[in-house]
C-alpha cells in the first residue's frame, strides 16, 4: 500500500467545458495528434455540448476524465511486462516506456479507458498526475490551469488534507466503484 495516495476531486458544477485541462495536458506531454491523456464528456449525452431542458431553463454538466490512479489498478495487475506501475511513495500509476511493448492489455483492462496507445512510439501512455510538476511542489497542470477551479488535488488518504475534507463535505463519489479498483478521482 502506498504511503500517500494522490488523487483529485472534480467539482462538475464548476466545469465550463472549455477543455483547457485536455489541451494543456496534451501540449505538456507532447502527445501526438489524436492521443489524449484526458477527455471531457457531457453528462447524459453521447455528443458533447448538448443541453438539457428548453430555453430559458437549460443546463449542461461536463465531466472531465483522467486516469483514476486506483489503489488497485487493473492496468497494473494485467500488464504482462510490468511496464505499468504504481509508485509506492504517492500512489501515482504510470507507464515505463522502456519496458512497455505496446500490446494494449492495459487499455483493455482499465474500466475507465485511461491508458491510450501511442501508435508512433508503440507504447501505452496515460495521465501521470503531472508527477514531475508535483515533485517540484507544483500542482498538476489541469488543476492550476482550470479557469473554473473545478479540480482539487492532494493526498486523498490523509483525512486532514484539504482534498479529503472536501470529498467528505461534498459527498463526492468515484466513478464505477463496483469495479473494485478503488479509484482516487472523485466527482461531485
Regions found by a protein language model. Give the residues of each.
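Non-ligating segments of multi-cofactor redox enzymes
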Residues: 1-188
Amino acid at each position: 500500500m502506498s504511503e500517500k495516495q494522490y488523487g483529485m476531486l472534480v467539482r462538475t458544477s464548476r466545469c465550463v467545458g472549455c477543455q483547457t485541462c485536455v489541451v494543456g495536458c496534451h501540449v505538456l506531454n507532447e502527445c501526438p495528434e489524436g492521443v489524449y491523456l484526458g477527455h471531457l464528456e457531457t453528462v447524459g449525452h453521447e455528443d458533447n455540448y448538448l443541453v438539457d431542458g428548453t430555453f430559458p431553463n437549460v443546463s449542461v454538466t461536463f465531466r472531465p476524465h483522467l486516469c483514476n490512479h486506483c489503489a488497485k489498478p487493473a492496468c497494473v495487475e494485467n500488464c504482462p511486462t510490468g511496464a505499468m506501475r504504481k509508485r509506492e511513495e504517492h500512489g501515482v500509476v504510470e507507464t515505463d516506456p522502456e519496458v512497455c511493448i505496446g500490446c494494449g492489455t492495459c487499455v483493455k483492462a482499465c474500466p475507465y479507458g485511461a491508458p491510450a496507445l501511442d501508435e508512433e512510439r508503440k507504447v501505452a501512455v496515460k495521465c501521470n498526475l503531472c508527477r514531475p510538476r508535483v515533485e517540484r511542489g507544483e500542482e498538476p497542470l489541469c488543476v492550476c490551469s482550470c479557469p473554473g477551479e473545478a479540480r482539487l488535488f492532494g493526498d486523498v488518504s490523509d483525512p486532514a488534507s484539504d482534498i479529503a475534507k472536501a470529498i467528505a463535505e461534498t459527498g463526492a463519489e468515484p466513478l464505477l466503484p463496483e469495479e473494485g479498483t478503488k479509484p482516487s478521482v472523485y466527482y461531485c
